[in-house]
Amino acid sequence: MQLNSTEISELIKQRIAQFNVVSEAHNEGTIVSVSDGVIRIHGLAECMQGEMISLPGNRYAIALNLERDSVGAVVMGPYADLAEGMKVKCTGRILEVPVGRGLLGRVVNTLGAPIDGKGPLENDGFSAVEAIAPGVIERQSVDQPVQTGYKSVDAMIPIGRGQRELIIGDRQTGKTALAIDAIINQRDSGIKCVYVAIGQKASTISNVVRKLEEHGALANTIVVVATASESAALQYLAPYAGCAMGEYFRDRGEDALIVYDDLSKQAVAYRQISLLLRRPPGREAFPGDVFYLHSRLLERAARVNAEYVEAFTKGEVKGKTGSLTALPIIETQAGDVSAFVPTNVISITDGQIFLETNLFNAGIRPAVNPGISVSRVGGAAQTKIMKKLSGGIRTALAQYRELAAFSQFASDLDDATRKQLDHGQKVTELLKQKQYAPMSVAQQSLVLFAAERGYLADVELAKIGSFEAALLAYVDRDHAPLMQEINQSGGYNDEIEGKLKGILDSFKATQSW
């Protein structure tokens, strides 16, 4: 078969008409320098602040410095094989992490990838790590409690849902223990928890995860990990990633609790990044925006009103408020709370729990110093019974501290002073609590009632612990319905007062401690 020239030219014209060129524009640049996880890129003309930049080897960097002729970015992951001259591309996306109920019970890294060997995540979607905090109109006042299970905290420094309460103290004073016990105490409360470990040893984090699992609290907890061996960029971003995971529950009308352990290490990681990016250093060599580093993170912890939740869920959830409660941890050096980062975080948060080395070494654990620990908004969230019974405890301890200092110089003391000193010592002993042994509202209320109404007056100081243990065993055995009623209602009236008095009178008669 022969084709003439006309047919050939027609076929060629048809093929040309059908030919479709799909052009794909890439904003591409070249690495001009690599140093300690920070790369400088030339040629990225349309790069956003915080944008993900695609690197060779399925890795990403985040653009932090946008300069006239170059972009400074931090690499998320290993950077030893990156070299000058390598091509990189803008992605047009801000960093996002997986969020949803499928993350509960899982251990993930800063980027949301599972590291617990339990298979892939079943996430509900993705959320940007950087988000704007809810506005003033979208918030609701804090009036519901978060029970930590610690007598000294729930009585004197109460925490409310949507509050930011700082845990501050030197190393080895029980900061992490307090936060982990608060998470364990939420296993039956319906509050979802997020634990963010920043710059810690992998063995320490493994121990925390094991303890959460042993006490049945891992099932409603997400653990976000950026170990000490990971890059400064991942340590800097870990709290924001954890916050995005917690906001998923807040925005859907649920309650969540997030622990940042600890923000001192995040500030150090951010200082390292900033100095490598050649940003001008300020006080203690921190960059000028280190206050904003923590304020934009902690302002995202809030209680949002029902209108906000309804608008966010497009009407699916109605009449429910959501909350994200934050427990940031700060490590001080030799008890110096006037250093740069501690003062910043104290001014941002709604109160602080100050843990003291001297108290810890004296066996008073949790080592809470009630004198300078404060909760600025939690009082409104306390249950009625705790509010009624805790006032006397704080006063007794304040008077005891004052008299204890004075009595060191006075040889002879009158009976009233001796009684106050004795009462203060017994209350201090009563507030001691073992780790991983959180107490219910009813148990705390009963113990505080015993202290306030003078039932400890004839109990020896050395037997306060056994008195408490025997009392709790007695009520669990013989008065469980009353304990259940107090736990559910949190109310306080003459009837409940009479019942508590009756329980203590009958228990004291047994002399079983």
From Swiss-Prot:
Task: Point out the annotated site residues (description: Required for activity).
Answer: 373
Membrane topology reported for the UniProt record: Peripheral membrane protein
EC main class here is translocase
Which InterPro entries is this protein grouped with?
Answer: ATP_synth_asu-like_sf (IPR023366), ATP_synth_asu_C (IPR000793), ATP_synth_asu_C_sf (IPR038376), ATP_synth_F1_a_nt-bd_dom (IPR033732), ATP_synth_F1_asu (IPR005294), ATPase_a/bsu_AS (IPR020003), ATPase_F1/V1/A1_a/bsu_N (IPR004100), ATPase_F1/V1/A1_a/bsu_N_sf (IPR036121)
Annotated catalysed reactions: ATP + H2O + 4 H(+)(in) = ADP + phosphate + 5 H(+)(out)
The cellular location(s) given in this protein's UniProt record come to: Cell inner membrane
Q: What does this protein do?
A: Produces ATP from ADP in the presence of a proton gradient across the membrane. The alpha chain is a regulatory subunit.
Family as reported in the entry's similarity comment: Belongs to the ATPase alpha/beta chains family.
NCBIfam families to which the protein is assigned, alphabetical: atpA (TIGR00962), PRK13343.1 (NF009884)
Q: What is this protein called?
A: ATP synthase subunit alpha
